């Protein structure tokens, strides 16, 4: 289902009887908007929920995710930091899902020296441990001479506002469908983690976002922080001729009817894949073999 909402890297929070959508905005837009819906079909623009005035960043506001926690709403996101000009991960807090969100601190949550970090995803395990998954962005992350986006993981504290210890590598582009398009620039980005029947399912996107081959795969682990094994069924969400171009950077949520849903973006113009994208929602679930699927048809 095409929601008609322009944006990329979408995240949908269900809170009570309403759904709240957050997404990446164009580079020059200084903040994030929130869209609200009762039925996932009709969406109302609720205005800006976070702007550069409440953030460490000043542009390139990307991939916001919001969790409800201890009566507050906590947003993890990335933005461009003045001075270093690197993309950093921030954390902001609000009293309502529509904001206004304000940074918990005057500096980013995560700043890796000389590296841009993006696509923050907070995963709270049922044993009480919290994790932040994120992507080391390929313009500043060079591995064996290749610009490489890799998925990382680091522990979060009990308030979800500080990191604990060191980050570790979770996934890197190493499969044929992830690397055949471009040998000099490669991606594993946009991480999201689900837990099902005691196992951890990591979804991620590979290939260039402005390419029709941008697609979603998944990997499975026995522990939240891995090691993860990529599925042979990948990609599970990919280009469909004459229908859908560049589906990717997904997230999951449970709808009011109890069904698992997947939010993702596609290129707004099938015939002209580029940065302009629109948000879609599809059914998702697990098959008889325990493999994750997204039913986009």
What residues fall within each predicted segment?
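Carbohydrate-active catalytic/glycan-binding domains of CAZyme proteins
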Residues: 1-297
């Amino acid at each position: 289902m095409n929601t008609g909402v322009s944006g990329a890297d979408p995240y949908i929070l269900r809170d009570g009887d309403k759904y709240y959508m957050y997404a990446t905005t164009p580079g020059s837009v200084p903040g994030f908007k929130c869209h609200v819906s009762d039925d996932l079909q009709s969406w109302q623009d609720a205005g800006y929920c976070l702007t550069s005035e409440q953030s460490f960043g000043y542009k390139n506001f990307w991939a916001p995710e919001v969790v409800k926690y201890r009566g507050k709403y906590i947003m993890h996101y990335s933005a461009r930091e003045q001075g270093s000009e690197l993309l950093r991960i921030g954390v902001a807090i609000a009293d309502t899902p529509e904001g206004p969100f304000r940074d918990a601190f005057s500096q980013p949550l995560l700043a890796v020296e000389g590296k841009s970090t993006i696509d923050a995803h907070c995963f709270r395990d049922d044993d009480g441990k919290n994790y932040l998954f994120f992507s080391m962005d390929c313009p500043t992350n060079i591995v064996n001479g290749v610009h490489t986006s890799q998925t990382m993981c680091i522990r979060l504290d009990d308030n979800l506002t500080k990191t604990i210890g060191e980050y570790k590598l979770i996934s890197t582009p190493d499969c044929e469908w992830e690397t055949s398009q471009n040998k000099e620039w490669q991606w594993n980005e946009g991480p999201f983690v689900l837990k099902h029947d005691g196992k951890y399912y990591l979804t991620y996107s590979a290939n260039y976002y402005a390419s029709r081959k941008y697609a979603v795969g998944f990997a499975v682990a026995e522990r939240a922080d891995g090691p993860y094994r990529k599925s042979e069924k990948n990609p599970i969400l990919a280009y469909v001729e004459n229908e859908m171009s560049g589906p990717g950077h997904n997230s999951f949520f449970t709808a009011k009817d109890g069904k698992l849903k997947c939010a993702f973006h596609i290129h707004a113009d099938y015939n002209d894949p580029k940065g302009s994208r629109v948000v879609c929602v599809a059914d998702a679930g697990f098959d008889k073999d325990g493999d994750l699927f997204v039913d986009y048809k």
